Structure formats: structure tokens, C-alpha cells
């Protein structure tokens, strides 16, 4: 289900402040965030965020195409190791 347009995009309040501090300093440092639910806004373009995946922070460089998506979409939480090997085939 899509969020109502009249509500606007959801962004945690502290995230805007952190992004402004990095922009003002001019340094290109990774902004560590735990808010996977926050929407990527146009003022985040060009910044690098470390999105927490439950284990570590995955660096995500925000581009124009990412605006409107959620941070959590770009930091997978599960690792796929493939399906289990067929033990009968190995014995032969």
C-alpha cells in the first residue's frame, strides 16, 4: 500500500540534521544511519550513507535515480548461499 500524498515522505528528523552538517563541512564522509524506513530526498543526492543491515553498515552513495525509494532497499539483510547440494549426487 502506498503512503498518502498529503502526508509527504517519511524521514527521521535526525537524518536531515546530519545531512546538513556534512554538506556544510564540505567533507565527503559516510553518515551512519539505522533508519532503513526513511525515504531518500533530493537533498541527499551526492552524499554517502552507511545503512545498517542488522550486522554492519553498508555504504550507499545516493544518486538521482534513488530519490523516492527507502534506504533499506539498498542494504540487503539476508545472505543467500544457494540451495543445498544434492548429497546423493556427491556420493557417486
Swiss-Prot record:
One of its GO terms (molecular function) is structural constituent of ribosome. The keyword RNA-binding applies. GO terms for cellular component: cytoplasm; small ribosomal subunit. Belongs to the universal ribosomal protein uS19 family. Keywords: Ribonucleoprotein, Ribosomal protein, RNA-binding, rRNA-binding. The keyword Nucleus does not apply. It comes from Bartonella henselae (strain ATCC 49882 / DSM 28221 / CCUG 30454 / Houston 1). SUPFAM superfamilies: Ribosomal protein S19. This is Small ribosomal subunit protein uS19. One of its GO terms (biological process) is translation. It holds the Pfam family Ribosomal_S19. PROSITE patterns: RIBOSOMAL_S19. InterPro entries: Ribosomal_uS19 (IPR002222), Ribosomal_uS19_bac-type (IPR005732), Ribosomal_uS19_CS (IPR020934), Ribosomal_uS19_SF (IPR023575). Protein S19 forms a complex with S13 that binds strongly to the 16S ribosomal RNA.
Amino acid at each position: 500500500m502506498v503512503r498518502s500524498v498529503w502526508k509527504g515522505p517519511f524521514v527521521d528528523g535526525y537524518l536531515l540534521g546530519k545531512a546538513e552538517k556534512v554538506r556544510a563541512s564540505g567533507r565527503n564522509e559516510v553518515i551512519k544511519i539505522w533508519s532503513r524506513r526513511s525515504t531518500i530526498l533530493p537533498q541527499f543526492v551526492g552524499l554517502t550513507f552507511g545503512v545498517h543491515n542488522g550486522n554492519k553498515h553498508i555504504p550507499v552513495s545516493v544518486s538521482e535515480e534513488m530519490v523516492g525509494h527507502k534506504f533499506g532497499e539498498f542494504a540487503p539483510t539476508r545472505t543467500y548461499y544457494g540451495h543445498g547440494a544434492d548429497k546423493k549426487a556427491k556420493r557417486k
